Every structure is written in C-alpha cells, then in structure tokens.
Amino acid sequence: MAGVMARFFYGANKIVATALFLVLPAALPIAAQKSPSQSASHKTSTKDASGDSSKPKLVVILVVDQMRGDYIDKFQRQWTGGLKRLVDEGAWFHEAAYPYGATETCVGHSTISTGAFPASHGMIGNEWWDREQQKDVTCTADASVKNMAYEDGRAPAASGAVVGASSSTSKAAGDSAARMLIPAFAEELKFQSGAGTRVVAMSLKARAAITLAGHQADSVTWWDGGTGLWQTSSAYPQAPFIAEFVKLHPVTEDYGKTWASLLPESAYLYDKAAVNVGSPAGYGSTFPHPLRGATDGKGPDVSFYLQWATSPYAETYLTHMAEEAVEKLQLGSGAGIDFLSISFSSVDYVGHAFGPRSWEIQDELARLDRDLDEFFTHLDKTVGRGKYVVAFSSDHGVAPVPEDLHKTGVDAGRLNLEEVRSRIEQTLEPLHYAKPSVARIDGADVYFTRGTYTKLKSDPLALQAVIDAMQGTPGVARVYHAEELDDRPATRNPIRAAEAAGYFKTRSGDLLIVPKPYWIWDYSAPGKPARNGGTSHGTPHYYDQRVPVILMGTGIRRGKYYELATPADIAPTLATICGITLATQDGRTLHEALDGSQSTQGPSSTQAPSSAQARSRSEAHTPADR
C-alpha cells in the first residue's frame, strides 16, 4: 500500500523540533554506496557477553506498523496487558517523531534498525524509479536471490503456488537488504557482541522483516499475501522451526472465523461506521467482519488472505511464531546477546482501510495488548524478567480519512497525481520537450525521462513554469527541485529540512511534491472517482511523523520523557546498552532513559517539558491530531 498524505501547515509547533532534529545530522556526510560488510566496526569480538549482568541476554524490537503516537493517549485506558506494561514500566518518549517527510514502511523500519535517516541509509520509499533500469524497484528487490516458500500443509493446487521448504516462488526477483546502504543494529550486534548471537526477524511484510534484520541474519520470515505462504529468500538461511511451525499451523485454519468487536460499545471513541470510499479489505463498513474471502464459504482465496492480514488474527499468529522462535532457538540463553524483531503489519492494513478514527483500529490495538501480554509473560518465563530489553515503536503514523474531515469543513482531499502529470506534459509540450517528459510519479517523487531534467536545469524559466503548474493542482502546497534538497542544506524551513533528510540523490525524484495537510495521494484518472478508499501516509505532517518510542527492560529507567526524540535514537541507545558501536548514526543515545549501569547522564524519572516545548506541542496538536 504505497501511501502518502498531507503536509505544510501543521502549525508553528514542530517547526522548532524538526529543525533541532536535523542540525547535527545535517553536518554528517551521506553514506557512500559501499557494501555494509566494509564497515570498520565489523570486527568480530571473541568476548563472551553472557557474563556481564548489566547487558541483556536478548534484544527485542517491536514495531507496530502505522501506530500513531496519539493512540497511546487515546486508547491506553482500555489496555490491561502488554501495551499497558510498556507504558507503565518503560521509558516512554511522549513526543517522539520522525524528522523527515518520507514516512513510509521501508523508510521507517530502516531508520529504526540503523539509527540513521534516509539520506544516510538510502531507503527513500517502499519503491522508487531506477533511472538506470528505467523501471520501478521495490526497496528490498534483489535479482541475485530467490524467495523460498515454506510448505504449510496445503496441496499445491490449494495454495496457488509451488510449495516446499526449499522451493522457489514464481517471483522474478527475490528480496534482501542489498539496497540498504549501511548495517543494521542487529548486524553490528552479531559481529561485535561475541560468538553465538542469533538474529531472528519476522513480519507479514518483507520490507519490514528484512530491514530490521539487515544483511546477515539467522532467520528472516515474511508472508506472501498472494499465495498465503510464509517465505524467506536465499539471502538468509532457512529456519527448520519456521518450516515446522507453519506446517502445523496453516493460516487457512482461520478461514471462516469472524472478527467481532472485543470491547463494549461504550468504550469505542468514534462512530461505528468508518467513513470510507470503497470496500475496505472486502469487509463491510461495520463489525462483525467474517473472514470468508470472495467465495463466501467455498474455501480460502486471495480475498481471504487480505482479510486475514487486515485482522487481529494475523497479529496473534505472529506472536505465536515469535514465541516458537524463543522456545526452539532458546533465544536469550546462549553465549551472545540474541536479537528478535517482530513487525506487526495488521494495524497498517486496518488503518489504511478504516482510518484512525474507527472502531476497527481501536479494537485491533486492544487485541494486540492481549497478544503482547502473552508474549512478555513468555519472555519472563523463558529468558527471565530483567534479562531482556524491548524497544517499541512504529514506522510512521497516518492521516485521517479525508472525507471524514471534509464533511466537518476542513480542507482535505485526494491529490490526483495523474492531473499533476498532465499539467507537466501540457506545460512542456509547446516548449519542444520530449513527450512523454515524465517517466514516473511515485507519491511525492516526480521522475523525468532521460535528459529532460538536465535540459530543465539549464532552462530556469521552463522549470519554474513546471513548478507553477504543479502548484496549481488542488492539494499541492509546495514543490521542491533536487538542488534545493541535496547535501542536507542548512535551512530554517522545517519542511525543506524534513524533505532533505529523506532525500537520496540517486534514488529520489527530480522534483518532490509537498501536499497540503490532510490531502493524500490519488492515482486515478483525472475527473474519475478516487481509485482507493481509506487513507494513507508519507508526508512531513505531524500525524505522519509522530510515533511511539518506548524502551523497557535491562538498562532502562522507567518514566515519561518529553525530550526531543526520534526512532533513529533506538539503535544508538540499544548499542550503548549492549556495548557496541554503530557504523553510521544520525540518532542519539537516549541517556536520560538509561539507568546508572549504562549512563551517568539523565534525569531519574518523568521529565516535565520546557515552556518552549509545551508551547510547541500545544500548537502542533491543534489540528494535527484530528
């Protein structure tokens, strides 16, 4: 779901905060495009980390895809399990936010895993236009590897694909972390913390599991929504425990079940029926949601797989798979510091379909609260309470469904990118430019055909005419050209700074569109109804940028913190706790949340915000958390 949305007037609020985030990173050089294996920090240590009681035995990164930061404030009173434990026992950075505009899944997961921004790690979106190959590429696409499906007990005819623990899928290119240009925290942990460290990652999405694990891992597992099969690729070892688990527990066991509301009606904050254009995941607009696909009782199909992914059943399945990994691999019981990451994707699918102001999103989180309670209890019993550290965050937030806001009089809508393309072509045609002049528009990124942008740069009047035409499109707030963003320019404009932090010269567009707040991308033909309903993300607006950052466990001082923080701070902080060094980082170590065994800096408990920070937040929340 290549989503994106609105931007520009999120208030004087995060203007100061975003600029502060980018002051130091702006001085750092963009990582050279070299193999992460060349990192100077990749020196394997022979020291056994198991004897140091100040270090965790297991590092766990939990990512809830598309979890807005304000969901905790809105829904936590209904939580009694794992989410409640994170808030109560963890170090919660209340105002954490991404300081860049490319708030998408691949970008956020890469930032969490590396401690760097897109301008350093190179993952600028879920996909981008490859100028050399003249085609779209996904962020984890790798033609040198093959994806391998795990058999799950179904006959091949039922699954729609050749299955087996060592069989290749039909996809032309496989998936790996080859396009991520710097090492992940998990890789550095494996190289530096001592022999025996195991790295395990899992998610419904390949781009989530792979980027959290990095280039070298012991088990990386994701799900193919087209076949309903779990898979890995030849870039990683196949995991016998995964093969056994999915064979014993096929996803199709959930066929015919119904997702009904968990909470009493009085507990839900919003209207029962979500405002939506279209049919969300093949469901109706209100509970209950039966998981019966398009065949309605004739067996699992692709529609069922979409429904399953857009339901709490998928999160529960991943939780059980993670518990199996801990049990079978004895994670947290070896000679090194082990690593486990789980990215829960269903909140993202539910959010895209129903929006953040829906019963479904509230219910999904209430059920995840139960799953995480079970998971933490399992870790307490197998690894030991106090012997593991958890980092909890999200890859991005999300905008409200624009129609939901529009009916209240807010300027919100769907920015038609085909109209943007048409305006560019109409502007350049009489100036004798090649037709077509536009090769691809992917959300904010506009890519021109070969030679067109070079010609435009030498013709400033034509370039300005194109930008003016684009800015006349309903929903467009601003257009930047590449030269305004390259090399992270020093700027007091927080929007330009945010776009620059997400810009990577050889991958980003020639022009970048900044939508107005509460406007999201629409790829339908001009004048036609919106192709997709629901909502999306992918802009430098606060509702896209603000996400949870919570640390809990070994080395962490619990409390509620109001200091500036970003998910890029997670990897540096975990590195400090584990006693390793990252190759490249744009984030900082959150010293204020570390206990005395890890840091001599920082406060002892909850930190009240300064008056400037409090003023900044109040301004930001005025419309941005609608």
Features from the language model and the residues they span:
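Active-site-proximal N-terminal segment of extracellular/periplasmic enzymes that hydrolyze or transfer
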Residues: 34-92
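Secreted, luminal/periplasmic, and some membrane-associated catalytic domains
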Residues: 78, 95, 104, 126-174, ...
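Active-site regions of oxyanion-processing enzymes, predominantly non-cytosolic
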Residues: 191-192, 196-203, 209-212, 315-349, ...
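Active-site His/acidic residue clusters
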Residues: 210-219, 291-306, 310, 330-368, ...
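Short Gly/Ser/Thr- and charged-rich N-terminal loops/segments
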Residues: 601, 606-615
